[in-house]
Amino acid sequence: MHTAGADGRQFHGLMADPRIVEHHRLVSFDLPWHGKSPPPEGAIQGSWRLSTDLYVALIMGFIAAAGLEKPVALGASMSGEICLELAYRHPEAFTGIIACEACDKINQRQTAWAAHPQVNQAQFVPEWIRALSAPQSPAEYVDQIAWHDGQGGPQVFFGDIAFYSDEWDARERVGRIDTNRCRLFMLTGEYDYSCTVELSEATAAKIPGVRFLAMKGIGHFPFAENPKRFAEYLLPILAELKG
C-alpha cells in the first residue's frame, strides 16, 4: 500500500525484482483520488480527507473485490500505520502483516502549506518529503518519489496527512493486537525522522509477540527509495510466512 499523496508506482522496484516475483504475487492499488483511482462522482475538489475507518473499509473492500485470500499486508508511513489497525481489527484476514515506518501516534507532521491556495503543491510537497529518504538511496528512486507526490491533486497529500499525523491515534489499542492470530512485523529505517526508530520501537514494546527491526541505510519510503536494499529485509519475512 502506497504512502501519502502517492500511488502504486512506488512498488515498481519490488515488482521488477525476480527474487520476489518468482515466488510471490504482488498486488498494489491506488486509493481514491490517487494515481489511476479518480475521486467519487460529484466529489468537490480538495475535499479528500482520509480517516482510520475509511482506510480500513477501502482496504478490506479491495481485498474482497480482488478475491485475495489471506494476503500479506505491506505498507509504510500512513499505510504502515493502517497495517497496525488491520492487525487489530482483522487479524483473521491476513497471513501476516508488515508495518513499516509506523507507530501508534505521530505528531507535528501536518503542514498547512500543503493546502494553502497561494502555494504550488506540486512543488512544495516533493520538497517537504525529499529529505525523508536515506542519503544512500539511489537518486533515481528518490526523484521518482518526489515526482509521484508532485502529481497529486489539490489537497490530496494534505488529506492523507490529516490521517497520518492527526486523526490516527492507536495508543490505547495497539497493546490489544493478538499476534497469535496474525504474525506482525514492524520495520523502520534508521534515517526516518518522521516516524523514528525510537517511536516504532516504543510502539512495538506494547505489542506482545511482534517482531521489530531497524533497517540500516533506509529512510521513510523503504520499498520506493531503495527496493533492492529493502528486499533484503523483506525476503526472509516472506519466506517465513510462506513456510
Q: Across the structure, where does each feature detected by a protein language model lie?
A:
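The serine-hydrolase catalytic nucleophile loop
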Residues: 4-16
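Active-site loop/oxyanion-hole signature of alpha/beta-hydrolase fold enzymes
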Residues: 22-74, 232
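Gly/Ala-rich beta-loop-alpha elbow adjacent to hydrolase catalytic centers
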Residues: 75, 79, 83
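Flexible "cap/lid" loop of the alpha/beta hydrolase fold
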Residues: 84-125
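Conserved alpha/beta-hydrolase catalytic His-Asp/Glu region
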Residues: 108, 121-179
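Short beta-strand/loop motif that positions the catalytic acidic residue
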Residues: 180, 186-188
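Acidic catalytic loop of the alpha/beta-hydrolase fold
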Residues: 190-195
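Catalytic active-site module of serine/aspartate enzymes centered on a nucleophile-bearing elbow/loop
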Residues: 210-243
